[in-house]
Amino acid sequence: QSAGMQSILWDIDRIGQLTREIMETVAKQNKGKHKYSKEALKELKKAMEQIQMIYGSCIRAISGDVDMDIKELMRQKEDIMQLDEKMRKNHIARVGKGKCDSKLTIPFNDVLHNIDRIGNSCVNLVEVAKENVTMQAFFAED
């Protein structure tokens, strides 16, 4: 139980760190000389909304929702990976058309990588929950 609880806490903390990195990267780029295009921001918003849904599902799982379907979560994670690939291609196309600055390619890819890593941590959380390790252990009575 304690190793599972430690894993839950580590992944939740990691998700928080990655989310902060995403927010800082996007904010920094939008305050600087080079800004993301409206299309790029729209795609990033969509990716964050998808990861938010996955995160909500994994929180329900570690809160004791035994009906959480790990296969469905993996499908959602796969959807994010496909969106990631599409967003990278779209960014390169926008750079080619002059809609996005090539100097934003590395920060944009960093954001996408962090979104993928959040998805990985969400999958980890559900896998731990499937082993009957949940946050309910914090509230166990003596």
Tell what function each PLM region has:
Residues Q1-D142:
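Cytosolic, long alpha-helical scaffolding segments
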